[in-house]
């Protein structure tokens, strides 16, 4: 690119390390020389059972009975979905906003809070998008590492807030990629600090715990949720957040008007109408998580961390990072995809999403060969 053009672009973005997303399934299949149906995806914490039958039926009904809906812009206020979410989470629609996945809502919160030079606390190892998005807005990121068991260092966070004037903290509950639950008492202590606390509950349905009931009574609390994991709608990009009315007005001002597409809203509403089926699927995944964890823990040289999510973090107690990478690569050659993170504190770990029983058995068969 000519220097005259690059001079018009932000130099801080040129220096930014790009986020590494999951490679598309078809690309991976071609790279591995395997048919798509042979690939077992245990790398992105997706729902192995897919969307609910009612969601699929609702999408088919739109295509068959009202295809014109795809030709007109969607409801900018997400009226039907927010009403359904209000019934689901017990918060009024006025405290709920929807987005194209919780990723968009993370971005909106940072856009509303952070100016260049402002400070955000990050608690690694955690979801990398928090620090990535903060860097996009020119924020200074103060890292307060988690404990050996991946709990939040509350005193360290409080010190960073007092010392650096931090304005914002994102915490995944349960944490990704460790699966660590976040105690309600920890959240309540952090809410006493002069910061906006955003709790990312992407895996809340698997954990069975939430602090969304505190929204409204604690003005500095934001709770984010997604339909990607428990509802099996990752490909449609639909999430939501609940927060105090004084805060949510800022997000309504800056969000794109038609940010949630018609198909996503239809499928999300139908998923909430099919709640018993969805929660039954969640229960199956949780039960399979425990079975898989026990089987992995029985393998030599692997420590499995307790998880409240739909994935398991496993540390190599022998062989370190080289062994973790080798296991990932060996599994990939067999068409089984897991996640490896080249990050401090977890570079000798692999993360395994909980699949169907037969998928997990295929994983275990290979691990028994190479462990």
From Swiss-Prot:
MF-aspect GO terms: histidinol-phosphate transaminase activity; pyridoxal phosphate binding
Source superkingdom: Bacteria
UniProt KW keywords: Amino-acid biosynthesis, Aminotransferase, Histidine biosynthesis, Pyridoxal phosphate, Transferase
Biological processes per GO annotation: L-histidine biosynthetic process
EC number(s) on file: 2.6.1.9
Pfam families membership: Aminotran_1_2
InterPro entries for this protein: Aminotransferase_I/II_large, HisP_aminotrans, PyrdxlP-dep_Trfase, PyrdxlP-dep_Trfase_major, PyrdxlP-dep_Trfase_small
Disulfide bonds: none
Record's keyword annotation contains Transferase: yes
4Fe-4S is among the record's keywords: no
Known cofactor(s): pyridoxal 5'-phosphate
This protein's pathway: Amino-acid biosynthesis; L-histidine biosynthesis; L-histidine from 5-phospho-alpha-D-ribose 1-diphosphate: step 7/9
HAMAP family in UniProt: HisC_aminotrans_2 (MF_01023)
Protein name: Histidinol-phosphate aminotransferase
């Amino acid at each position: 690119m000519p220097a005259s053009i690059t001079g018009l672009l932000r130099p801080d973005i040129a220096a930014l390390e790009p986020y590494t997303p999951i490679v598309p399934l078809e690309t991976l299949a071609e790279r591995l020389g395997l048919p798509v149906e042979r690939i077992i995806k245990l790398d992105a914490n997706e729902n192995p059972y897919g969307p609910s039958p009612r969601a699929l039926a609702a999408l088919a009904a739109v295509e068959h009975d009202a295809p014109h809906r795809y030709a007109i812009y969607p409801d900018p206020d997400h009226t039907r979905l927010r009403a359904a979410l209000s019934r689901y989470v017990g918060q009024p629609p006025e405290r709920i906003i929807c987005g194209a996945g919780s990723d968009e809502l993370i971005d909106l919160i940072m856009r509303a809070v952070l100016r260049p030079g402002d400070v955000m606390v990050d608690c690694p190892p955690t979801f990398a998008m928090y620090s990535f998005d903060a860097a996009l807005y020119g924020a200074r990121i103060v890292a307060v590492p988690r404990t050996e068991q991946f709990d939040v260092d509350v005193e360290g966070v409080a010190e960073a807030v007092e010392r650096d004037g931090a304005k914002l903290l994102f915490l995944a509950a349960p944490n990704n990629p460790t699966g660590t639950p976040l105690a309600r008492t920890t959240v309540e202590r952090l809410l006493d600090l002069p910061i906006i606390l955003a709790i990312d509950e992407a895996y809340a349905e698997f954990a069975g715990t939430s602090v969304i009931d505190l929204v409204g009574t604690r003005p500095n609390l934001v709770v984010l949720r997604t339909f990607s994991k428990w509802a099996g709608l990752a490909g449609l990009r639909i999430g939501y957040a609940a927060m105090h009315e004084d805060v949510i007005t800022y997000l309504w001002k800056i969000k794109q008007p038609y940010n949630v597409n018609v198909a996503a809203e239809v499928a999300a509403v139908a998923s909430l109408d099919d709640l018993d089926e969805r929660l039954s699927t969640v229960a199956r995944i949780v039960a399979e998580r425990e079975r898989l964890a026990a089987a992995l823990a029985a393998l030599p040289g692997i420590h499995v961390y307790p998880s409240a999510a739909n994935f398991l973090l496993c540390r190599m107690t022998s062989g370190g990072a080289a062994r973790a990478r080798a296991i990932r690569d060996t599994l990939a050659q067999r068409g089984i995809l897991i996640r490896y993170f080249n990050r401090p504190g977890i570079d000798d770990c692999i993360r395994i999403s909980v699949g169907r029983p037969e998928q997990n058995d295929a994983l275990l068969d290979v691990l028994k060969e190479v462990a």
